[in-house]
Amino acid sequence: MFLNSILVVITDLAAGLLGNTSFRRHFHLLLSALLLFGPLLSLWVSHYSVFAKRTHFLYRVFLRSGWGWTCIFVGSFVFVLSFSVRRSLTLSLRHLSRLAVAGGLWLGFRKLLCLLENATGSCYEPLSAALEMTSGTNGEGQPLLLLREAETKETCVRSGMLWRGYEVSEDALLLCLCCLLLAEETAVFGPYLNLGGPSEAPLRILFLFCVLLLSLWVFLLLCLLAYFPEFPTQLLGGALGCLSWRALYQGWYRLRPSWYCPGRPGVGLLSTQSKQDELLETQTNAKEID
């Protein structure tokens, strides 16, 4: 009973924050500010910190599988929320289709960025020590590099050679997209609670996991910007993530739900009670105005 009371208090506070109009309106601006000024933290952070190593537990377990973690927790929350209200598998699948669309967009960006990197970059092999002693170094004292043709970035890096070219940070893109997606999908929980919707412990626990995951993604984004600054690749990646969110949640999903549009989060969950449904959609609309 005591733990359940704590769970209720924490989730109510988190739902109030995520459903707040000011938070919804300015959260993407917060991420933009992090992308712009986060690299400046590299002037003060310690490079001997555990977060300065790419092999850190959080990077290996969460960042490399970021989209998977997001789908697991957000998908579970969306399904339980929608199914507990309407008991309609069709409605639940319609709301889950937003994750499928975002996942397809993420995979498409990965393929496109891979093609861009391979088309604009080149692979270089450092000359051996003996050959460097014979040929010398370049004018700046840097070791000579031998250009290797017809090499992709993946095979080049795997062979221990150097890859130089134009890049867009996939990590920044993924983290920004996941943060904005989490904020959108969980924001409906506040209006849902205000309307007296069923909120048992399993649903609140899933919501709490989503909030913790959102906090973790923001923290990892800050760590990447502070300990591994890569300007402007991270800025470009974050911009793509924000543009993807705006195109989906501020554009396409605002259309009326149909076979070609899954609709906004929370729409149709309480349509069996027309007055409550109208109130929920009105509150959701007001909080999504940018």
UniProtKB/Swiss-Prot annotation:
User: Where, per UniProt, does this protein localize?
Assistant: Endoplasmic reticulum membrane
| Membrane topology per record | Multi-pass membrane protein
Q: Which residues cross the membrane?
A: 1-21, 26-46, 65-85, 173-193, 205-225
Q: Which UniProt keywords apply?
A: Endoplasmic reticulum, Membrane, Transmembrane, Transmembrane helix
Q: In the UniProt record, does the keyword Cell cycle occur?
A: no
Please provide the Gene Ontology terms (biological process) for this protein. lipid droplet formation; lipid droplet organization; lipid storage; phospholipid biosynthetic process
Question: Which segments of the protein form a coiled coil according to its record?
Answer: none
Organism's domain of life?
Eukaryota
**Cellular compartments per GO CC:** endoplasmic reticulum membrane
Any idea which GO molecular function terms this record carries?
Answer: coenzyme A diphosphatase activity; diacylglycerol binding; triglyceride binding
Q: Does the keyword Oxidoreductase apply?
A: no
Coarse class of the protein's main subcellular location:
endoplasmic reticulum
Family membership, please give it: Belongs to the FIT family. FIT1 subfamily.
Q: What does this protein do?
A: May play an important role in the formation of lipid droplets (LDs) which are storage organelles at the center of lipid and energy homeostasis. May directly bind to diacylglycerol (DAGs) and triacylglycerol.
PANTHER family cross-referenced by the UniProt entry: ACYL-COENZYME A DIPHOSPHATASE FITM2, FAT STORAGE-INDUCING TRANSMEMBRANE PROTEIN 1
Q: What is this protein called?
A: Fat storage-inducing transmembrane protein 1
Q: State the species of origin.
A: Danio rerio (Zebrafish)
Recorded name of the encoding gene: fitm1l
